[in-house]
């Protein structure tokens, strides 16, 4: 039994609140256990200079944490005048993952800005951001469809992410909270599509190694969790799902 009473391959309690903010074209508050992230999607009727004239759109992301998202207050990165390497890595990961399932040609010459703001952190903030951002993005695309600016919702598949790891005597566990993540021998983030295709796998041993058999076990656990997350995304999107499938 894990520190929070879950089974080894059990997700934390997940809730996706849609249309959480008034102004963005799409927004959600995603809760993954005690991790809470607000994800918003903004549609801009232009593309970056390097994309002009190509007839395709672009998806990019920004990621941040409020100062007391963590147990100890952290200084806002805007106060420092630059983002950290960790933040840059995460926002590139979010944008890259979403672009893998967006039909950029069907989107047209538009930019989708994804903003992920962590308001409470208890492990898995980047994977929660990706899972929530996908829903926010599809909600924004539905607005484009309703306005007849696109002929279909420009996504090719679903997308979700979770963490897996090897924690001391527990072995392989799914969806690590902070207490588990901080003592994990192996930590891995996995992003997959609804068709079971991998978008990204990030895995490292923390002063430890892992075998090929353990890698397979980690990926199996992640796949199971991601398919559950995609079912929750579909539930959150409601009737919009009919425009995707």
UniProtKB/Swiss-Prot annotation:
It is an enzyme of class 2 (transferase). CDD domains: RNase_PH_bact. It catalyses: tRNA(n+1) + phosphate = tRNA(n) + a ribonucleoside 5'-diphosphate. Keywords: Nucleotidyltransferase, RNA-binding, rRNA processing, Transferase, tRNA processing, tRNA-binding. Its EC number is 2.7.7.56. The keyword Secreted does not apply. GO terms for biological process: rRNA catabolic process; rRNA processing; tRNA processing. It holds the Pfam family RNase_PH_C. GO terms for molecular function: 3'-5'-RNA exonuclease activity; RNA binding; tRNA binding; tRNA nucleotidyltransferase activity. Gene3D superfamilies: GHMP Kinase, N-terminal domain. Phosphate binds at residues 86, 124-126. PROSITE patterns: RIBONUCLEASE_PH (PS01277). SUPFAM superfamilies: Ribonuclease PH domain 2-like (SSF55666), Ribosomal protein S5 domain 2-like (SSF54211). Belongs to the RNase PH family. Phosphorolytic 3'-5' exoribonuclease that plays an important role in tRNA 3'-end maturation. Removes nucleotide residues following the 3'-CCA terminus of tRNAs; can also add nucleotides to the ends of RNA molecules by using nucleoside diphosphates as substrates, but this may not be physiologically important. Probably plays a role in initiation of 16S rRNA degradation (leading to ribosome degradation) during starvation. Homohexameric ring arranged as a trimer of dimers. This is Ribonuclease PH.
């Amino acid at each position: 039994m894990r520190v929070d009473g879950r089974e080894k391959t059990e997700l934390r309690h997940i809730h996706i609140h849609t249309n959480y903010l008034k102004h963005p074209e799409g927004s959600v508050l995603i809760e993954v256990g005690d991790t809470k992230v607000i994800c918003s999607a903004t549609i801009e009727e232009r593309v970056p200079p390097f994309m002009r004239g190509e007839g395709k759109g672009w998806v990019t992301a920004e990621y941040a944490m409020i100062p007391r998202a963590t147990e100890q207050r952290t200084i806002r990165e805007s106060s420092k005048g630059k983002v950290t390497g960790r933040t840059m890595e995460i926002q590139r990961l979010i944008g890259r993952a979403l672009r893998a399932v967006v039909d950029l040609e069907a989107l047209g010459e538009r930019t989708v800005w994804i903003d992920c703001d962590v308001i409470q952190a208890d492990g898995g903030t980047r994977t929660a951001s990706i899972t929530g951002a996908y829903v926010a993005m599809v909600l924004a695309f539905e607005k484009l469809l309703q306005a007849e600016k696109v002929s279909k919702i420009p996504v090719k598949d679903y997308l979700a992410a979770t963490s897996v790891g090897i924690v001391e005597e527990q072995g392989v566990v799914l969806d690590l909270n902070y207490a588990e993540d901080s003592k994990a021998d192996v930590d891995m983030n996995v992003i997959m599509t609804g068709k079971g295709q991998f978008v990204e796998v990030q895995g490292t041993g923390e002063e430890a190694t892992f075998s090929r058999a353990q890698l397979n076990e980690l990926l199996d656990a992640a796949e199971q969790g991601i398919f559950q997350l995609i079912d929750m995304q579909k539930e959150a999107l409601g009737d919009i799902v009919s425009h995707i499938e």
